[in-house]
Every structure is written in structure tokens, then in C-alpha cells.
């Protein structure tokens, strides 16, 4: 499940670190989280869509690696990001 242009722009505006930021880790994690949410709801309805399940697992792994990178750089940025996105308990 992909994001359309308006959804992407809203995510970028909400998570960018400066005015022209479109690829920072925060933006990437926010986009991945939104795609993961959409794909999870799709898979609840379509339980036998195994190729989408594989893609979901890859996205979760990528998000996990990006979050690990942020955590290593700055614990404060990491905590702010997971709180803002509501992805960890």
C-alpha cells in the first residue's frame, strides 16, 4: 500500500527537521510507519496475501534498523520520534 502525494507531503511537513528536509531519518521512519499501518489493515482482511506479508516484514525490519541508528546517535531524538509516532509502548 503506497502513500499518495498529499499524504507524503503531510508526513514530511510534520516530521522534517528544517525547511527543505525530505529524507532525514525521522521522515523516513514516519513514512514507513504509515505504510506499515496501511499494509497491516490490508493483511487483516486478506490473510492469504503472502507477498504483501513479506513486504510488510521487510518494512518493519527497515524501520527497526533506522530506529536503531537514531537511538545510537541521540537518545533524545529517538524518544521524541517514538512518542510522536506512537509506535512503541
UniProtKB/Swiss-Prot annotation:
It comes from the Bacteria. CDD domains: Ribosomal_S15p_S13e. One of its GO terms (biological process) is translation. Keywords: Ribonucleoprotein, Ribosomal protein, RNA-binding, rRNA-binding. Part of the 30S ribosomal subunit. Forms a bridge to the 50S subunit in the 70S ribosome, contacting the 23S rRNA. One of the primary rRNA binding proteins, it binds directly to 16S rRNA where it helps nucleate assembly of the platform of the 30S subunit by binding and bridging several RNA helices of the 16S rRNA. This is Small ribosomal subunit protein uS15. It comes from Prochlorococcus marinus (strain MIT 9313).
Amino acid at each position: 500500500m503506497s502513500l499518495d502525494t498529499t499524504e507524503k507531503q503531510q508526513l514530511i511537513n510534520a516530521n522534517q527537521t528544517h525547511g527543505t528536509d525530505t529524507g532525514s531519518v525521522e521522515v523516513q521512519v514516519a513514512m514507513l510507519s504509515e505504510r506499515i499501518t496501511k499494509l497491516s489493515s490490508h493483511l487483516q482482511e486478506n490473510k492469504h496475501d503472502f507477498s504483501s506479508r513479506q513486504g510488510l516484514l521487510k518494512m518493519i525490519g527497515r524501520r527497526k534498523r533506522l530506529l536503531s541508528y537514531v537511538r545510537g546517535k541521540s537518545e533524545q531524538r529517538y524518544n521524541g520520534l517514538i512518542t510522536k509516532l506512537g509506535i512503541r509502548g
